[in-house]
Amino acid sequence: MIGDMNELLLKSVEVLPPLPDTVSKLRKYVSEANSNIETMKVAEIISSDPLMMAKLLQLANSPYYGFTREITTINQVITLLGVGNIINIVMADSIRDNFKIDVSPYGLNTQNFLKTCNEEATFIANWLNDEDKKLSHLLVPCAMLLRLGIVIFSNFLIQNHKDKDFLAFLNKSENLALAENEFLGVDHISFLGFLLHRWNFDDVLIESICFVRTPHAAREKVKKSAYALAITDHLFAPHDGSSPFNAKAAVALLKEAKTQGINFDLNNLLSKLPNKAKEN
């Protein structure tokens, strides 16, 4: 993948904003503590960054996690979500805040795009919280970043005056992955896998992203998360998410997962489909 990637795009990755110091401190502590991680120490590191602490509490009380009572302390957040998920959430949130967003090169309305990105994360939570809360907690940060590649690609295309050519090619081909590979040497989902690896995200998250298009080929440990993201990717595809074709493809993926020994509740998925998909 990286061998085919546009060289200028690779260079632009080198100057992406660094992650906050708090994330570096958390990572360093977890790495040094190994299995002897203390909740109080993690809370102490997070509490040294009031903005991050406030955002974590806000996210913990959002619909993403569906807790029935209000979460009021960082210790509660750490106990309920686990240190690994906390680090993923903090990283995902700080990354999202670092980018100027203009997705006009894709022919998309930026406000609608942002709304859909939030709906993706909410969908993962609503769909999986009842049947696999652990998987839901793992995938919410990933869903928050699922379209980050589109944001970075858009900025790159605009800066290099290729945005109009890209959109013309996209409109003509009606094939998003083809257009991205033609102009950038990689599609936005594969590029996200590359970025998560570069930022040292959790290995399971990285692998889940890398197998979104081929979940059946993922190793057993990540197969269920890869299928969950693949289903979400179909339902919220940037240009034709929730179309009759994509809604049927999402259900077909769930049935395919069953042949791989991965069980999702079909009725639960059907009841949690986005409204547009239900209409179809």
What are these model-derived regions, one by one?
Residues 1-145, 151-159, 183-185, 190-245:
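Conserved alpha-helical "signature site"
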Residues 1-8, 256-280:
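Terminal helices and disordered tails flanking the catalytic cores of nucleotide-processing hydrolases
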Residues 76, 163-191, 218-226, 254-264:
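Divalent-cation-assisted or electrostatically stabilized phosphate/pyrophosphate-binding catalytic cores
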Residues 247-250, 256:
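Cytosolic terminal low-complexity segments enriched in Ser/Thr and acidic residues
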